[in-house]
Every structure is written in structure tokens, then in C-alpha cells.
Design a protein with these regions (language model features):
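Bacterial N-terminal signal peptides that target proteins for export
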Residues: 1-8
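Short, low-complexity N-terminal intrinsically disordered segments enriched in polar/charged residues
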Residues: 9-47
Length: 143
């Protein structure tokens, strides 16, 4: 029986191989670019800097929420572990189908663990933006 971390590792390896076969090799530069976007948004959220946090979102997300204020209301109400994490750590990016996905483990303000799956979108200028985030409880409890 495979644990969650082992399964994630297998998915990551298979995903990377599939991406390379499609000519979309996932390189260290892309990995660093995605992490920089996510860390930038987490830091902006920690300062309640809605304008900066909103700037890391993809154009489609920006169209959906229209203003930094509306975006921040959504984050505060639905993404508390991301908005006020006790801690977070990056896992290996996943490339299976669709856009690259960056898993990030969070311990939320209530001490509960979640994995946030960040769907990343490459922009015309080569930069990355966050195209969506889903939260998945892990059952972990932080100190």
C-alpha cells in the first residue's frame, strides 16, 4: 500500500516523463518561477497587500474577482490556511494533464494541515501566474 507522499512522488515522476514526451520539459527555471509567484502571493497576503496578491493571479482570475478587495474577501473567507499559515512547504511540481500544478503543504491558523494545489499558467511574456488553487485536507495537525 502506497502512502500519500509515495503516491505524489510517483505521480510527479510520471507527470514529468509525460511532459517531456510532449516537449514541455519541466526545468529548474520554470520551477523557480512558479515558486516565486506563489511565495510572492503568500507574502503579500501576510501583509494584507491585496493589490500585490491580486497581481499574482492569472488574467482569468482577475476578471472573475474584478478588484483586489473582492479577491481578498474570497481569500479571507475560503483560504484561511493560505491567508494566515503557521507554516508552509513546497512539494515537487506535478505535470500530468493540463497546466503544471505546484503542491504546497500548509499548516493553517487552526493547526490543521492542507495541501494547496496551485494551477499555474504561463503568460505570453514567459512569466507564471496563479490560475487557481484548491485545498485538500491532510488530516495532519501542526503544533
Amino acid at each position: 500500500v502506497m502512502g500519500g507522499a509515495q503516491l505524489a512522488g510517483v505521480i510527479s515522476i510520471v507527470g514529468r516523463a509525460a511532459a517531456e514526451a510532449r516537449g514541455q520539459a519541466f526545468d529548474a527555471e520554470a520551477d523557480a518561477g512558479m515558486r516565486a509567484m506563489i511565495e510572492g502571493q503568500i507574502e503579500a497576503l501576510s501583509r494584507d497587500d491585496g493589490v500585490t496578491a491580486f497581481g499574482f493571479a492569472s488574467p482569468d482570475i482577475q476578471k472573475t474577482f474584478r478588484t483586489p478587495e473582492q479577491f481578498m474577501r474570497m481569500v479571507r473567507s475560503s483560504f484561511k490556511p493560505v491567508y494566515r499559515p503557521r507554516s508552509y512547504s513546497f512539494e515537487a511540481p506535478l505535470l500530468v494533464e493540463g497546466p503544471p500544478t505546484q503542491p504546497v503543504r500548509f499548516i493553517g491558523p487552526d493547526g490543521r494541515g492542507v495541501v494547496a494545489l496551485y494551477k499555474m499558467e504561463r503568460q505570453d511574456d514567459g512569466s507564471w501566474r496563479i490560475g487557481g488553487v484548491t485545498l485538500h485536507p491532510t488530516g495532519e495537525r501542526g503544533i
